[in-house]
Amino acid sequence: MSPKFLSLLTAEDLKDVTALDVGCGTGQLALTLAPLCRRVIGIDRDAEAILKARERTGALSLHNAEFVIADADVEEYTAWAPQLVAARLCMSPAIIARSGRALGPGEVLAFVCFHRDQWKETGVVSRFAFDEGEIRALLEGHGFTVEHLEIEREVHQFASAEEGVAQAAGLRAKWESNGRWQRYVEFLEGGGRTLTRSHLIVKARRR
């Protein structure tokens, strides 16, 4: 998890805060926040991920963290009354809109999301990826003032096409299903020798 992202969260006084982790997966972010917050709720539509998050909570003996099966793009967040909404690699216009409705003045939405340059060598832009202007406009349009926005980028460089294939081997099955793999191989065969990981780190405060 990005140290910069964590520092943006922990810069807030969290001891009396109810935090909502949207798209929580198996709970990594929520369980990191739990010792710092009054209460943490993680939501995800993946029932298996929620079960694992609950198991991790029990193993850590955390009593202020709970995990709920819910679609972050569909459910309204007001029922959980959060003072902080956080997300890691789960972002959409619907999430920003729901956060804007749930948070009060001065309260924070903080997240890491895919930048449009994520895996740019594959020639496919994720529908969950944004550039700086897009994310700023969405936030400002839903009542937020952007306090921090930066790109965290890592470019892997390879000496050969074979090395590039090996670097992305863990992504092959997923990329074959969405058309990325063949384009990435073509990029390497054409002389390309990079693979870019690029995220936006954002903190915004409700006006």
Predicted segments with their positions:
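Conserved alpha-helix/loop element of class I SAM-dependent methyltransferases that forms part
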Residues: 1-17
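Class I SAM-dependent methyltransferase SAM/SAH-binding core
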Residues: 20, 26-74
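A short acidic, Gly/Pro-enriched loop at the edge of an enzyme's catalytic core
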Residues: 74-84
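A short SAM/SAH-binding and catalytic strip from SAM-dependent methyltransferases
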Residues: 82-96
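A short glycine-rich, Lys/Arg-flanked "PGG" loop and its adjoining helix->strand segment in the class I
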Residues: 96-108
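Conserved class I S-adenosyl-L-methionine
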Residues: 108-134
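A SAM-dependent methyltransferase catalytic signature shared across enzymes that methylate proteins
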Residues: 136-151
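Conserved Class I S-adenosyl-L-methionine
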Residues: 150-207
